[in-house]
């Protein structure tokens, strides 16, 4: 069987890492050839191991929508693709491509159901002219969230109708999405497949007093500004602790200035790092203060390294990873910054036995999402689609 995944950049982030894990497993199973169609390819990041697991082909940018769609269809025919996995959203005319080529189409949603409602509001505030339009007109239209939600439902329904399978990141999402779209979950083609998490060979339980954020500095979704305000609340009560932020992105300048304005102490901006494992190895706590998350890999990576995850329970995916609350991590009511600060103080005050128990349970929780288990779910989906 030949399967192709459509990405923007490759290999560049969490979704791309998941594709690589799936490809490695299916390569080992045998009978599969995996392709990646990507707009931007980072050749220096394509190790021999990755190249052995899959074949990467370049496609035009989304800015050239018609050219991109035609090239994808040409590659489907050329490579004899049986299943096309569209990461995050459908490509234009996917229904036509399905009819003309006989290829099965999958949409793999890597956010929470109807995640577009957050992006819609954010994009209407990007750029000088859009910000003016936002203040004069759109701010009132989108004030209560109902318009963004309606648009998100319309886009998701279009993606759902034009694919053979729509995957989400946990079973709670499957039920939530079916209800939102008015579809019976028992007859839908929505499938729940979690993100995989690799094993860590040598877990370090001798942690430093470090609270770690690791991710893209994109404040509309990650809301790192909340974490800085929370640190301002607890920094003097935790004099032997530090806050470390790993990553970069458009909000970095604003966040650095905010750290100065709040007079934050023992805070470090580490920038983009190719080796984030060294930070997880040392961190006692991994903190997430996001507005929205699908299945945050930073939390599952934290568990794999024996870190204690703390996050707002903004979505079912976050709750699934950290539950049971207080045993595999800590779930804070969204978006209560005072409660989050209290939770950090609570974690810092854990005795050695309590701390060890939580870290051990977190590591055990990760075993549910080993690449072999998750990739087997993908294999089952692909086999099911070809039988239809």
Regions found by a protein language model. Give the residues of each.
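Conserved donor-binding/catalytic core segment of Leloir-type glycosyltransferases
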Residues: 4-6, 202-222, 228-231
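N-terminal strand-loop element at the rim of the active site
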Residues: 5-13, 19, 25-64, 173, ...
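Short His-centered aromatic/hydrophobic patch
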Residues: 86-92, 109-112
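A short, active-site helix/loop in glycosyltransferases that binds the activated sugar's phosphate group
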Residues: 146-187
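Aromatic "clamp/platform" in nucleotide-sugar-dependent glycosyltransferases that forms part
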Residues: 272, 291
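Short hydrophobic beta-strand element within catalytic cores of glycosyltransferases
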Residues: 308-312
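Conserved acidic donor-binding segment of nucleotide-sugar-dependent glycosyltransferases
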Residues: 323-338, 346-352
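A charged, aromatic-enriched C-terminal amphipathic alpha-helix characteristic of glycosyltransferases
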Residues: 352, 356-386
